[in-house]
Swiss-Prot record:
Belongs to the calcium channel alpha-1 subunit (TC 1.A.1.11) family. PANTHER family: VOLTAGE-DEPENDENT CALCIUM CHANNEL TYPE A SUBUNIT ALPHA-1, VOLTAGE-DEPENDENT CALCIUM CHANNEL TYPE D SUBUNIT ALPHA-1. Gene3D superfamilies: 1.10.287.70, 6.10.250.2180, 6.10.250.2500, Voltage-gated potassium channels. Chain C. It comes from Musca domestica (House fly). II repeats lie at residues 420-667. This is Muscle calcium channel subunit alpha-1. Residues 81-99, 146-157, 217-302, 455-467, 516-525, 584-639, 810-826, 878-885, 942-1030, 1130-1143, 1192-1219, 1278-1343 are extracellular.
């Protein structure tokens, strides 16, 4: 019976599973069926055999792989194609043209099949509804059109432009790789916030382009020509502008007929070219060239302001917003993808658990089946018998074997095993010992040191030494590897990642040695293999915890970055192929000119050029060539710039910033990882200790019989844990892990408080000063008081500033110049002052021995150093001593003394110091990588960068004597020149020079030039051969990706994260997040804005007109039209065209003047000029008038003047400076008015100003840095001769302070900073200025540390402070838009002024509802919010209510902020308020107590609040509605109880007209009425209470009756209190009225045993269901019942 049951149950379970399985597939199939339309192309149904066939093919994986393979093959075909100039071709290209037809057929077939399968366009899942399919279809159609056209029209039609679209096919590979889609999705999601920024960038570009057009139009067309021959002056192979700044030499004149710089591309002649030039400047490439050209033409008085402001605003601020948005979006996208993955895993886990449960059920059911007991007994007996027989046989065999075999071998084997185990144990102990660890580290560094000694022209003995030491180190590291393998066993050894890495390095090194000695491999391959040795350097990371953590996080990043690199590669391939199609073979301009190295003539070269543009280095030069290739500016060529701009924006701004986004994201992960590890570390070490002890015990007890687990497994466990927790050295604990930003940073506030100036000033340190002055000594007390007097401090600060300014005023050329002598006298005075201050402080605080002594503070030591340096330089005032020169330079550290005297500045400096400490590990890893690449570079390129000035000579031995040189390729101008054998400025002849070269490459400056020098490099002592080793480009690309894209971005990311964390430290103990703090700060500090409303009827009408939205829009449109007319100007425009533009300008000026007059009439003087925008408008109108008048006068003067050409020219020159160059700006400034229009732009502008407010100390630090470096630059490099063709010339030098600052600003933007560094270094071609007192050696070795340190400080640290601030303030662009932020709150102030025009700071509580309904969420309720819902929200807001029915501005704004951000709104409201008050006092210490009482209520029960008032109103409203519904039901059989209830309700509702008017405030009517603009204040509570008191008396018997009949409890409470009011009628005051109302509400709430002030609790009480005579009546819910007021 049981046997029969069991299979049935089992079958049932299996049948269930079978039943469920097809359902799932069916459902999936169903989904797919849904995607298919019933008919495709109006005729093919789902049962059509052709369509079924197409669906099968399209859905198969094989087809998908085939198409991807075809795309890849198509890419290869496009890459093999070689473009030739002038339409030439070769056999390969012709073959490829034929193959193109095959590809076209395949892609067309795919397209047709998919259209048949999916339908064309009408259905939701149809073919063209998918973006990738649309792209395919577009490419196929273009391909067919281009093929048809090329066959039909044989000549005169170029289809190349159409064919170029083929290169978009590789984009389809993205749809095949999921990891690519995460990166691409995050970029696409970022497009919406990026669009906001794009508009801002466009706005900045347009403004600067129009200013440039007005100021510099036609200025760059003058150049020097010979007076007689008419030849251009071009000593330096390129022409430059002449004019005020650059005077032509004798024999030459300045003529106005030059096309302009870069073949006329770089100029401001029309709006288009002006925009292109501005965009180029914002990308920081070639902006100094444009500036210097303008300065040559117009002088250098003010032009730099235009360019410097453009760079700061455009490049540093606006462009960094892109970075902020991308990093925000990427982390959001990553989190989404991670959550999606986690959810998927959870679902899979649930599915597995479900299946497991099914199986368990099946198993348990199977266990229930009892087998036949008799059969079981028989089976057992049979088994036992078999076992018995076998064991007897075995015993007999064993006895025989023991007798035959001697046991000696076995005992020996055991003995040897025991010894082996002991040796292994000893080896393992040795391998894990401190000594072994330090020995290996020492060997690694020695090996590294030996590798670093390699250099060009090294002696033979060094070669041999390196060879032998290499063999020695290989042997040692091999021994280490074998020892570890033996002690840990193979499995134990290879389980560690570092050991696998070691093994790889050792095997690589051995194979390299074998290949080198047998000469089987080419030298290039060997030199790369040799560098595998360098990876040993990373063995350090195994033992250094913080480093190993960083390396681990970097390895994690590589997974994310692999997909980005794939996308980057795809991007480069597509643009490379497109470049080949468009520009291939076109970069040949003149026969005598050499073709530019960056071109698109082959696929390989095209990839290199695109990669160069991607890095941004000299992208503008390639663009100029592209424009010239199509005929230049004066033809179709200018369109070519679109390709380069799109490539630059997508590549440089978007893709490369995603690198940074990934870096920051992974660093955050590493941070959390480190914290967890740190917590677990002690536990792991404890476990280790226990395991080791247990293992030893087991060994001692069991002797020979140690289990496999004890020998192998425990070792493995222990080893793994040792690997993890690093119990190697106690010193390691002193190092924090990578993520220890918080630990390190957290020490800062403590340090800050310890060094707080005020606390130091309080007491004299205990102990004697200089063993003379005790702490009670009067003289010491006097000194202490004097030092700490505020006036004394201010005086010293002024002295510091003046003495610093004098350092900047010195003449660097002549030390004995009269100006310097005067300044030196002042210097003596300031040094005396500083010495006196120092002595006073030393007496006051003591020198060094006791706590609080002067020298115990780092900042005081800085003071001491500066004063000592000044004293030494005065006493040894002889210029002969070079040490004194250096000491005089050190005086420039004086401004740093100001840091100790300005708290904010000190905080920023400490923040930077913390950042530098935190970044130490990253710097170390970067240096290790840099060092590795430098050694590889030395292997590859040492001694190979030499060249002869005569290109025909390849070797040094041939490079002697003279050669003929044709100037500008003109055969009529031969010149004799000496041959010179020169090394390149940057080379790899030794490791130090290689690291310098690589550092410049990592800054992206000048690397393409270096790349082509490397490609042409031949062999040691050999000259260049064109394209000799193209493969070496891989070295630079790998270096740039690893170091510049990845490591530098991680570095920058870490700086940003550290600065942001540092900012948070101040508030780490308060419970508010950053957004909540910002919003509360805004609410506390905000003030209402005055809104003037005239009383005179005519003036009111004018006011109403100018404040209306239609007037605003019309002005907006006029500004837009004005912008268009300003942009219509161009160089050499006809006379009549200029007159039209002038007339239009007059019209616009008249219109804007009318606007000014109307507004002045409406607002009067005081109110008009009270608004900053109005003042700005007035200045513009005034400036425009002056501009018109001035221009007209000058035009008439020129027309009337009957003079010779020379004096006319003079008149023109005089007029341009003021008229055009200044007053024309007022026309452009009208554009800025656009910023006041539009909420989005207003928000951006507000955040921008806020960013600037957050930057004063950062800006001060930058100013100080620039000042110090500029003065050092003047002192050290000021004597270098200004020479044309070098980087130190008339525009770029250190001879004056402003010039030095400009050079530094240029270096900070990275504009060829390495060229300036080389021009200041000690080289033979660096000459001294003839006016200086120096004869030679004007270059200095200080140039290298000077420029490198400045670049690192500026580009990596200081500029990133800007980025950190911007990312902090603009995070709302990527944040969820529904979260309230400070940027929303400006709208509240603006709309409040409509209800409170006099800015009294209070409005009627009734107006608050309409105000908040006007404001969109998240700040307000929005127009769609039902009126009653708005009242409910007001209950939760609960601001204090004044006796006249008004609420206060700050209280309302605070409540508006507090509710959406849920700032202390949970739990008991009184406790929450108390906590919030304490928090506000803690963070904003200077908050006015009265203001605090207004915004956060005290726990006083007697306070009347909006919450209590609207609670009362809502209770009434609910009852009114309840009664109305009951009346409508029209029940006739109402009992007396029902009548009583109605009476109670009527009592409430119809108390008096005054009650209805004041308490309900006609709220129902108000909901439908138009929002009132302004209201008059009137009293409220007097009327409420008098109306209550005038009502008829309610007897207590009535109340008792009501309570007996189970009526609504809080209604009874209300009525009881009504009686109480009647009894105390005579003694009630307005104050007690307030109290009684409040008590009523509180009593009614106490029914449920809780006192509420929050919306949720209020709603709980309201929804109480009253019972009446056994029937249950549910109060109506406004959400469900009130349909007319729904959202």
């Amino acid at each position: 019976m049981d046997d029969a049951v069991c299979p049935t149950e089992t079958d049932n379970v299996q049948n269930k599973q079978k039943a469920t399985t097809p359902k799932r597939t069916q459902r999936r199939g169903g989904k797919q069926q849904l995607d298919r339309p019933e008919r495709a192309l109006f005729c093919l149904t789902l049962k059509n055999p052709l369509r079924i066939f197409c669906i099968k093919i399209v859905d198969s994986k094989l087809f998908e792989y085939f198409i991807l393979l075809t795309i890849f093959a198509n890419c290869v075909a496009l890459a093999v194609y070689t473009p030739y100039p002038s339409g030439d071709s070769n056999i390969t290209n012709q073959m490829l043209e034929k193959i193109e037809y095959i590809f076209l057929v395949i892609f067309t077939s795919e397209c047709v099949m998919k259209i048949i399968a999916y339908g064309f366009v009408l259905h939701t899942g149809s073919y063209l509804r998918n973006g990738w399919n649309f792209l395919d279809f577009f490419i196929v159609v273009i391909g067919m059109i281009s093929t048809a056209l090329s066959n039909l029209v044989k000549e005169g039609f170029d289809v190349k432009a159409l064919r170029a679209f083929r290169v978009l096919r590789p984009l389809r590979l993205v749809s095949g790789v999921p990891s690519l889609q995460v990166v691409l999705n995050s970029i696409l999601k970022a497009m919406i916030p990026l669009l906001h920024i794009a508009l801002l960038v466009l706005f900045v570009i347009i403004i600067y382009a129009i200013i440039g057009l007005e100021l510099f139009s036609g200025k760059l067309h003058k150049t020097c020509r010979h007076s007689n021959t008419g030849e251009y002056l071009n000593d330096l192979d390129e022409l430059h502008a002449c004019g005020v700044g650059f005077k032509c030499p004798s024999g030459y004149e300045c003529f106005d007929d030059w096309v302009g710089p870069n073949d006329g591309i770089t100029n401001f002649d029309n709006f288009g070219l002006s925009m292109l030039t501005v965009f180029q400047c914002i990308t920081l490439e070639g902006w100094t060239d444009v500036l210097y050209s303008i300065q040559d033409a117009m002088g250098s008085s003010w032009e730099w302001i235009y360019f410097v402001s453009m760079v700061i605003l455009g490049a540093f601020f606006v462009m960094n917003l892109i970075l902020g948005v991308l990093s925000g979006e990427f982390s959001k996208e990553r989190t989404k993808a991670k959550n999606r993955g986690d959810f998927q895993k959870l679902r899979e886990k649930q599915q597995i658990e479900e299946d497991l449960r099914g199986y368990l059920d099946w198993i348990t059911q199977a266990e229930d089946i009892e087998p036949d007991p008799d059969a079981q007994i028989i089976e057992d007996c049979h088994k036992n018998k078999v076992k018995e027989v076998v064991s007897i046989d075995n015993l007999k065999d064993h006895e025989n074997e023991t007798q035959q075999t001697d046991s000696w071998f076995r005992s020996q084997k055991k003995y040897l095993e025991r010894i082996n185990r002991r040796i292994r144990r000893a080896c393992r102990k040795a391998v894990k010992s401190q000594a072994f660890y330090w020995l290996i580290i020492l060997l690694v560094f020695l090996n590294t040191g030996v590798l670093a000694t390699e250099h060009y022209r090294q002696p033979i003995w060094l070669d041999q030494f390196q060879e032998y030491t290499n063999i020695f180190f290989i042997a040692l590291f091999t021994c280490e590897m074998i020892l570890k393998m033996y002690s840990l066993g193979f499995q134990g050894y290879f389980v560690s990642l570092f050991n696998r890495f070691d093994c790889f390095v050792v095997i690589g090194s051995i194979s390299e040695m074998v290949l080198t000695s047998s000469e089987l491999m080419a030298p290039l391959g060997v030199s790369v293999l040799r560098c595998v040795r360098l990876l040993r350097v990373f063995k350090v990371t195994k033992y250094w915890h913080s480093l190993s953590n960083l390396v681990a996080s970097l390895l994690n990043s590589i997974q994310s970055i692999a997909s980005l690199l794939l996308l980057l590669f795809l991007f480069i391939v597509i643009f490379g192929l497109l470049g080949m199609q468009v520009f291939g073979g076109r970069f040949t301009f003149k026969p005598e000119e050499e073709k530019p190295r960056s071109n698109f003539d082959s696929f390989y070269q095209s990839l290199l050029t695109v990669f160069q543009i991607l890095t941004g280095e000299d992208w503008n030069v390639v663009m100029y060539d592209g424009i010239r290739a199509y005929g230049g500016v004066f033809s179709f060529g200018i369109v070519a710039c679109i390709y380069y701009i799109i490539l630059f924006i997508c590549g440089n701004y978007i893709l490369l910033n995603v690198f940074l986004a990934i870096a920051v994201d992974n660093l955050a992960d590493a941070d959390s990882l480190s914290t967890i590890e740190k917590e677990d570390e002690s536990q792991i070490q404890l476990d280790n200790q226990i395991k080791n002890e247990m293992e030893n015990e087991e060994y001692l007890q069991n002797g020979d019989h140690i289990s496999f687990k004890a020998e192998f497994g425990a070792d493995l466990d222990t080893y793994l844990q040792d690997e993890e927790c690093g119990s190697y050295s106690d010193d390691e604990n002193t190092y924090n892990k990578l993520g220890g930003v918080k630990q390190r940073v957290s020490s800062l506030p403590r340090r800050n408080t310890n060094t707080d100036m005020d606390r130091i000033k309080k007491d004299i340190p205990y102990g004697t000063s200089f063993f003379i002055f005790s702490h009670t000594n009067r003289f010491r007390i006097f000194c202490h008081r004097l030092c700490n007097h505020s006036n004394f401090g201010n005086f010293i600060l002024c002295c510091i500033m003046f003495s610093s300014a004098m350092l900047a005023a010195e003449n660097p050329l002549k030390a004995d110049a009269s100006r310097n002598i005067v300044l030196n006298k002042f210097d003596y005075f300031f040094t005396a002052v500083f010495t006196i201050e120092l002595v006073l402080k030393l007496i006051s605080y003591g020198f060094v021995l006791h706590d609080g002594a002067f020298c115990r503070s780092a900042f005081n030591l800085l003071d001491l150093l500066v004063v000592c340096v000044s004293l030494i330089s005065i006493f040894f005032n002889s210029n002969a001593i070079s040490v004194v020169k250096i000491l005089r330079v050190l005086r420039v550290l004086r401004p740093l003394r100001a840091i100790n005297r300005a708290k904010g500045l000190k905080h920023v400096v400490q923040c930077v110091i913390v950042a530098v400490k935190t970044i130490g590990n990253i710097v170390l890893v970067t240096c290790l990588l840099q060092f590795m690449f430098a050694v590889i570079g030395v292997q590859l390129f040492k001694g190979k960068f030499f060249s002869c000035s005569d290109g025909s000579k390849v070797y040094e031995s041939d490079c002697h004597g003279t050669y003929l040189f044709y100037e500008n390729g003109d055969i009529n101008k031969p010149r004799l020149k000496e041959r010179e054998w020169k090394n390149n400025k940057f080379h790899f002849d030794d490791v130090a020079k290689a690291m310098l070269t690589l550092f410049t490459v990592s800054t992206f400056e000048g690397w393409p030039t270096l790349l082509y020098v490397s490609i042409d490099s031949n062999k040691e002592n050999g000259g260049p051969i064109y394209n000799f080793r193209p493969i070496v480009a891989a070295y630079y690309i790998i270096y740039i990706i690893i170091i510049a894209f990845f490591m530098v971005n991680i570095f920058v990311g870490f700086v940003i994260v550290t600065f942001q964390n540092e900012g948070e430290q101040e508030y780490k103990n308060c419970e508010l997040d950053k957004n909540q703090r910002n919003c509360i700060e805004f609410a506390l500090k905000a003030k209402p804005v005055r809104r003037y409303i005239p009383k005179h009827s005519i003036q009111y009408k004018v006011w109403w007109f100018v404040t209306s939205s239609s007037f605003e829009y019309s002005i907006f449109v006029l500004i837009m039209i004005n912008t268009v007319t300003l942009a219509m100007k161009f160089y050499k425009q006809p006379e009549y065209y200029s007159e039209i533009l002038d007339a239009l300008n007059m019209i616009f000026t008249a219109v804007f003047s009318l606007e000014f007059i109307f507004k002045l009439a409406a607002f009067r003087f005081k109110n008009y000029f009270g608004d900053a925008w109005n003042t700005f408008d007035f200045i513009i109108v005034l400036g425009s008038f002056i501009d018109i008048v001035y221009s007209e006068i000058k035009t008439k003067e020129q027309a009337l003047a009957t003079c010779d050409g020379q004096s006319c020219n003079k008149a023109k020159g005089g007029s341009t400076l003021i008229s055009i160059n200044f007053f024309r700006l007022f026309r452009v400034m009208r554009l800025v008015k656009l910023l006041s229009k539009g909420e989005g732009i207003r928000t951006l502008l507000w955040t921008f100003i806020k960013s600037f407010q957050a930057l004063p100390y950062v800006a001060l630090l930058i100013v100080m840095l620039f000042f110090i470096y500029a003065v050092i630059g003047m002192q050290v490099f000021g004597k270098i001769m200004l020479e044309e063709g070098t980087s130190i010339d008339r525009n770029n030098n250190f001879q004056t302070f402003p010039q030095a600052v400009l050079v530094l600003f240029r270096s900070a933007t990275g504009e060829a900073w390495q060229e300036i560094m080389m021009a200041c270094s000690p080289r033979d071609d660096v000459k001294c200025d003839p006016e200086s007192d120096a004869v030679n050696n004007c270059g200095s070795s200080i140039a290298f540390p000077y420029f490198i340190s400045f670049y690192v400080l500026c580009s990596f640290l200081i500029i990133n402070l800007f980025v950190a601030v911007i990312m902090d303030n603009f995070d709302y662009l990527t944040r969820d838009w529904s979260i309230l932020g400070p940027h929303h709150l400006d709208e509240f102030i603006r709309l409040w002024s409509e209800y409170d025009p006099d800015a009294k700071g209070r409005i009627k509580h009734l107006d608050v509802v309409t105000l908040l309904r006007k404001i969109s969420p998240p700040l307000g309720f929005g127009k769609l919010c039902p009126h009653r819902m708005a009242c409910k929200r007001l209950v939760s807001m609960n601001m204090p209510l004044n006796s006249d029915g008004t609420v206060l501005f700050n209280a309302t704004l605070f409540a508006v902020v507090r509710l959406p951000l849920a700032i202390k709104t949970d739990g008991n409201i009184d406790e929450a308020n108390a906590e919030l008050r304490a928090t506000i006092k803690q963070i904003w210490k200077r908050t006015n107590p009265r203001l605090l009482d207004q915004v956060v209520l005290t726990g006083n029960d007697d306070e009347v609040t909006v919450g209590k008032f609207y609670a009362t109103y809502l209770i009434q409203d609910y009852f009114r509605r309840f009664k109305k519904r009951k009346e409508q039901e029209g029940k006739c059989d109402q009992t007396e109880n029902a009548v009583t209830l109605q009476a109670g309700l009527r009592t409430l509702q119809q108390n008096s007209p005054a009650l209805k008017r004041t308490i309900s405030g006609y709220l129902d009517e108000l909901a439908s009425e138009a929002d009132p603009m302004h209201r008059r204040h009137h009293s409220l509570f007097g009327k409420v209470m008098s109306s209550l008191l005038r009502h008829e008396e309610i007897t207590s018997s009535k109340i008792k009756h009501l309570s007996r009949t189970k009526t609504i409890p809080y209604q009874v409470e209300f009525l009881q209190h009504k009686v109480q009011l009647e009894r105390n009628k005579d003694c009630l005051t307005s104050a007690s009225d307030d109290i009684s109302i409040e008590k009523i509400i509180r009593k009614q709430n106490k029914y449920n045993g809780q006192y509420f002030n929050s919306e949720a609790n209020f709603m709980d009480n309201i929804k109480y269901t009253p019972r009446y005579d056994g029937e249950e009546y549910e109060m109506e819910d406004p959400k469900s019942k009130d349909k007319d007021e729904e959202f």
